[in-house]
């Protein structure tokens, strides 16, 4: 948790002692991300924290996801990549964790996936997705691919929570 500074610093020091130099922090906007906390941990421990930008899934979206355009949502992500997060010098290095609901991609989730694709196409940053109970991974990839994303730059999260080896192999074949 991002409220346990001493504990996290010790964990990062332990990782550094094992040769780890980079960690990816997948807590995105409106899910408790704390850019200054990450910067403080980086400065204290020397580890590099790769922060993310994006929106999680429909049930967790802030209201403005419904009212802003795809282009505006994409620009917010690009700004966090190019300019920094929450007024800090910490810049997002990955577009994540872009999620879908169990068994469906809602219209707002589709909007966010398209915005993530636009941000990826503009910045080249990789995308990491969230599947709910291993559903919709293939559909996520199809949506991203339809909007010009190089699928070798995408990871599909939590796709192994059900016995669906055929789907996993299909996703691997896509990139």
List each language-model region with its residue ranges.
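Conserved beta-strand edge residues that scaffold enzyme active sites
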Residues: 29-30, 56, 134
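Short active-site-adjacent helix-start/loop capping segments
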Residues: 24, 31-35, 58-61
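Active-site neighborhood of phospho(di)ester-bond hydrolases with catalytic His/Asp-centered motifs
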Residues: 24-26, 50-52, 156-158
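Active-site gating loops and adjacent loop-to-helix segments of metal-dependent hydrolytic enzymes
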Residues: 1-3, 53-71
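Divalent metal-binding segments
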Residues: 1-9, 27-30, 62, 101-107
